[in-house]
Swiss-Prot record:
<feature type="repeat" description="WD 5">
    <location>
        <begin position="201"/>
        <end position="248"/>
    </location>
</feature>
<keyword id="KW-0206">Cytoskeleton</keyword>
<feature type="repeat" description="WD 4">
    <location>
        <begin position="158"/>
        <end position="200"/>
    </location>
</feature>
<dbReference type="GO" id="GO:0036064">
    <property type="term" value="C:ciliary basal body"/>
</dbReference>
<dbReference type="Pfam" id="PF00566">
    <property type="entry name" value="RabGAP-TBC"/>
</dbReference>
<feature type="repeat" description="WD 7">
    <location>
        <begin position="297"/>
        <end position="334"/>
    </location>
</feature>
<feature type="repeat" description="WD 6">
    <location>
        <begin position="249"/>
        <end position="296"/>
    </location>
</feature>
<dbReference type="GO" id="GO:0060271">
    <property type="term" value="P:cilium assembly"/>
</dbReference>
<dbReference type="GO" id="GO:0060090">
    <property type="term" value="F:molecular adaptor activity"/>
</dbReference>
<feature type="repeat" description="WD 3">
    <location>
        <begin position="117"/>
        <end position="157"/>
    </location>
</feature>
<feature type="coiled-coil region">
    <location>
        <begin position="388"/>
        <end position="414"/>
    </location>
</feature>
<keyword id="KW-0677">Repeat</keyword>
<dbReference type="InterPro" id="IPR015943">
    <property type="entry name" value="WD40/YVTN_repeat-like_dom_sf"/>
</dbReference>
<feature type="coiled-coil region">
    <location>
        <begin position="699"/>
        <end position="844"/>
    </location>
</feature>
<dbReference type="InterPro" id="IPR001680">
    <property type="entry name" value="WD40_rpt"/>
</dbReference>
<feature type="repeat" description="WD 2">
    <location>
        <begin position="75"/>
        <end position="116"/>
    </location>
</feature>
<dbReference type="GO" id="GO:0034451">
    <property type="term" value="C:centriolar satellite"/>
</dbReference>
Length: 996
């Protein structure tokens, strides 16, 4: 089997040598995709879809890589990287280069395989899309999820319709019926509806499953003509519905191994006009079985339990099957290789001549049903309303040709003529012809009973003797040999039976029933008298071969006799292997085309012909090993020459030595049950069986006794071992105790020595520590001394800097003080001038007020005198006038007091302003004085001695003079204010004094 790893390649060949699917279980190629870019090194394929031609398909893995595989051109190409897993694919659109892919984000995209560009992006689903169904025209598509199904127009990529359902009822699948305009919708409650695509009118509804059936439909498949619907689920039953009659017409029960059906698909056939008869059923064990829905026979199967299938897709023309395996790889199967043994020849066109009279019908009730223009397979005639007609037979030659007429309507003589003309049967129809020639009954029940008995004890260790690489092939061989051994006891002791059956097992490994019946038919007919001298080789058969060889080639036989080569050397190896060791596959098939088409003696004649055709190399052989090697290995011999020689021997051999006179004619296996095979020395076989049984029983008894003795011996040994272990343990404990004591003493001595060394080391460390501390102390003192010296230098530098700054500040301060003194003297003169002016103004106002009061008093006196004179005129008027005058006087006095108060307030404000300015100058002078006061004593003395004498005297006497001056000034201002206030009060309190 070829395997192709896509790796990181974007294109390449699918296979690098011509596939041979017939020798590899029908597998053309196995495709895997491994990469190092992602964490999982093997990328699993998830979905596959074929195009309309059936020669190309697309496949997508779980990382979103989509490849196109062209089986006709042997090429693959990476067409898209979607970066997310695809959940469904469709590749049969109207534009052949476009395909649909449903992604994990619930969207559907359309890509082009040629340009590798995005054509359209469709959204609308709210859950994962599980299937895409495309209309036969390629213009419409239905995408199905668990909650909805949507109909899309692929010309505009717009959604046309949407199928919504209740949440309690989920959608199982919605798809188009092939070659029709009908949509089939299947729901999780087993309801199935058919809708018109254009109007969405409900055409019909299928009734529910029959009572007693608890199957829930999960998977569906429809034939190409759209007439039959197959449904399955978690059961081994399949329901077949007739969509035209809208009824269930058949229930197929799969084998008991099948517990659930995961996928269904019909196998298309070019000759059935769309009414597919073969249904592929993928079950939970990963095996896909193909059954005939009419005969309910298992035809073949793909996949194994070890290498199970996850999903499969069949090409539209039925040539290929693409299966995604459970390990994530992709297998491509050839349907022709899988069905080569069951293929039937195309039915010829026939012409109905006339009806056969009823009185000429033989005991067989078989009749050939004639459909319009075709010949059907034979069927038993029952009471039926359908009229049947049969071909007219040659009544005169009926008895002669009776044995040449096969059940399938083939004529043995015509086949022999065809075989002689072409040398072999057509590869496509060989298996069908063999089954017809051997007249296999296909007893399913009988074969199942043999298989159900399990593997025979004689073949349990078959793999050790015959190590076959293919597990499936070994399993089929073991099952076939076990069935033969259960059928007849002789085959459990036949050593060459695996060699005899292996070619047929390899040829019919997909159909074990046919394989068993072919081998059984071969043994009954072509292995006649082989077991009469069991367990020795068939001496009588070998004698026949030797007699024929003596008649046709005495020289060669004499050469064998001279070299002590018996028939067990030159004949028996060919018979027990049926020429499989000396011929290739094609040569072997060609030979058995002739063997099955002739009398059983043809096989014995073939042995003679093989030797006579090889007489030249055989005459040159002298050693027995050379002869043995010759008859066990392939030789440069033309099989066509051998076959022609066989026919020549069959015709020219005398009747007295001809094997056909000693061998019976062909006898087919009986229908229903297999015949009893007892053509062997029963007493020998029974004796051997009894001996084997006795030996087996003795061996079992011996094994049981040996097991008992071994158990007892094991118990004794175990007890002895326990005792010995206990003594050894005690001895070890004693020795360990002594050793521990010695170790303890040694450790104590070592401890004392270590303590002494530790004390010495401790003393040394203390001394070192003292020295180190002393050195550290000295180092610290030196460091502190250096730091103090550095600080002193820093302080000296700081003092010098501050002295310089102080000198500069003092000089600047002296200048500022001189300037300030001048300013203050100017302000003092200004203030004195203002004060004099204000005093003069106040005195002037007082004088004016005094003069006014005097004039007013004189006027009042004058008026008083006048009033006295006019007192006779009325006392009330005088009294009112007096009150008015007093009010006027009070008003004038208040006005003057207010003016005097305002003048005093203004003067006091000016005094306070000048005092504030003087107060602002005092802190600055005091700060300068304090800075000089905080200098060090030595420095202050030094500075005073260095200062100018005039500056020193000024700085010492200036504060005292200023304080005296300020005090005198404030005192004068306060006295003046006091006098003015007293005068104002006196003038306000005693106005009558002024009047007097």
């Amino acid at each position: 089997m070829q395997s192709t790893d896509l790796g990181n390649k974007e294109s390449g060949k699918i296979w690098h040598r011509k596939p041979s699917p017939a020798t590899h279980d029908g597998i053309i190629v196995n495709i895997v995709h491994s990469t190092s870019e992602y964490h999982p090194k093997v990328l699993r394929f998830l979905n596959v879809a074929f195009d309309g031609s059936g020669d190309s398909f697309i496949a997508g893995d779980h990382q979103g890589n989509i490849y196109v595989f062209d089986l006709h051109g042997n090429r693959f190409n990476l067409v898209q990287r979607t970066a997310q897993a695809c959940t469904a694919l469709a590749f049969n659109l109207r534009r052949k280069s476009e395909f649909l892919v449903a992604l994990a984000d619930y969207s559907i995209k359309c890509f082009d395989t040629v340009t590798k560009e995005l054509v359209s992006w469709m959204r609308g689903h709210e859950s994962s899309v599980c299937s895409i169904s495309v209309h036969a025209s390629g213009r419409y598509a239905i995408t199905t999820s668990s909650d909805t199904a949507q109909l899309w127009d692929l010309d505009t990529f717009q959604r046309k319709r949407k199928l919504n359902i209740r949440q309690s009822v989920g959608i199982q699948k919605v798809f188009f019926l092939p070659l029709s305009n009908t949509i089939l919708s299947c729901f999780k409650d087993n309801s199935i509806f058919a809708w018109e695509c254009d109007t969405l009118f409900c055409k019909y509804q299928l009734p529910g499953p029959p009572e007693g059936s608890n199957i829930l439909y999960k998977v569906f498949a429809v034939t190409r003509d759209g007439r039959i619907l197959a449904a399955g689920g978690k059961s081994n039953h399949l329901h077949l519905w007739c969509l035209e009659a809208t009824g269930l017409f058949r229930i197929i029960q799969m084998p008991a191994k099948v517990r659930a059906v995961r996928h269904l698909e019909f196998l298309p056939d070019s000759f059935d006009a769309g009414s597919n008869q073969v249904l592929g059923v993928l079950s939970q064990d990963g095996i896909m079985r193909f059954v005939n829905i009419q005969t309910c026979k298992l035809l073949f199967e793909i996949g194994t339990v070890e290498e199970g299938i996850s999903s499969s897709v069949i090409s539209p023309h039925g040539r290929y099957i693409a299966s995604i395996m459970e390990n994530g790889s992709l297998n491509v199967y050839s349907v022709q290789a899988l069905t080569q043994e069951i293929n039937k020849p195309p039915p010829p066109l026939v012409k109905v001549i006339e009806d056969l009279p009823s009185n000429t019908v033989s005991s067989s009730n078989l009749k050939m049903k004639i459909m319009p223009g075709r010949v059907q397979r034979p069927a038993r005639c029952k009471e039926s309303k359908i009229p049947t007609r049969v071909l007219k037979q040659d009544l005169t030659g009926d008895l002669e040709n009776k044995e040449n007429e096969l059940s399938e309507g083939l004529n043995k003589k015509r086949l022999q003529i065809l075989l002689k003309g072409y040398g072999e049967y057509p590869t496509k129809y060989r298996m069908f012809i063999w089954r017809s020639l051997l007249q296999l009954p296909e007893n399913h029940t009988a074969f199942s009973s043999l298989v159900d008995k399990g593997t025979h004890a004689a073949y349990l260790s078959l793999q050790k003797k015959y190590p076959i690489k293919s597990r499936k092939l070994l399993r089929v061989l073991q099952r076939t040999l076990s069935a033969l051994a259960h059928w007849s006891a002789i085959f459990s002791d036949t050593p060459y039976l695996p060699l005899l059956a292996f070619p047929f097992v390899k040829l019919f490994q997909n159909n074990q029933l046919i394989c068993f019946e072919v081998v059984a038919t071969l043994i009954i007919n072509w292995c006649q008298h082989w077991f009469e001298y069991f367990p020795n080789p068939p001496i009588n058969i070998l004698s026949m071969i030797e007699n024929v060889l003596a008649f046709h080639d005495k020289e060669l036989l004499q050469h064998f006799i001279d070299r002590d080569i018996t028939s067990q050397v030159y004949a028996w190896p060919l018979l027990e292997t049926l020429f499989s060791e000396v011929l290739t596959r094609e040569e072997w098939l060609r030979l058995f085309d002739n063997i099955f088409s002739n009398h059983p003696s043809f096989l014995l004649m073939t042995v003679v012909a093989y030797s006579t055709c090889s007489r030249a190399p055989l005459l040159n052989c002298t050693l027995k090993n050379d002869f043995e090697y010759f008859f066990h290995h392939r030789n440069n011999l033309d099989i066509n020459v051998v076959i022609r020689e066989v026919y020549h021997l069959m015709e020219t051999t005398p009747a007295d030595i001809h094997p056909n006179s000693m061998l019976d004619a062909f006898v087919a296996l009986t229908k229903g049950q297999y015949p009893i095979f007892n053509q062997y020395p029963k007493f020998i076989v029974d004796y051997q069986t009894r001996e084997w049984e006795r030996i087996r029983n003795d061996e079992l008894d011996f094994l049981r006794e040996r097991q008992t003795v071994e158990n007892m011996q094991a118990e004794v040994d175990e007890q002895r071992a326990k005792d010995e272990a206990w003594y050894q343990k005690q001895e070890l404990l004693r020795r360990a105790e002594e050793t521990r004591r010695e170790i303890l003493l040694q450790e104590e001595e070592k401890m004392a020595q270590q303590r002494q060394r530790l004390a010495a080391v401790k003393r040394e460390l203390e001394i070192k520590e003292i020295h180190l501390q002393d050195a550290a102390r000295r180092r610290l003192l030196k460091l502190q001394q250096d730091q103090r010296e550095m600080e002193l230098r820093r302080l000296e530098d700081e003092i010098e800097r501050k002295v310089q700054m102080r000198d500069q500040e003092i000089a600047a301060t002296a200048k500022d003080l001189e300037i300030r003194q001048l300013e203050l003297e100017a302000q003092k003169r200004l203030y004195e001038k203002d004060l004099t002016t204000s005093q003069e103004a106040v005195a002037k106002e007082i004088r004016e007020d005094t003069d006014a009061h005097r004039r007013k008093a004189a006027l009042e006196e004058h008026m008083f005198q006048k009033l006295l004179e006019n007192s006779q005129m009325g006392g009330r008027r005088a009294q009112r006038w007096k009150e008015a005058e007093e009010k006027e006087f009070h008003l004038q006095s208040a006005k003057k007091a207010s003016a005097l108060s305002d003048a005093s307030r203004k003067w006091f404000l000016r005094q306070e302003t000048s005092a504030a300015l003087e107060h602002e100058e005092m802190p600055w002078l005091q700060r300068q004085y304090m800075d000089s006061a905080y200098l060090p004593q030595t420095s202050r003395l030094h500075d005073v001695s260095d200062m100018d004498p005039s500056t020193h005297i000024f700085s010492r006497n200036y504060p005292t003079e200023w304080n005296h001056m300020e005090h005198d000034l404030l005192k004068n201002v306060r006295d003046l204010r006091r006098r003015l206030t007293a005068r104002a009060r006196n003038s306000c309190r005693h106005p009558h004094l002024l009047v007097t």
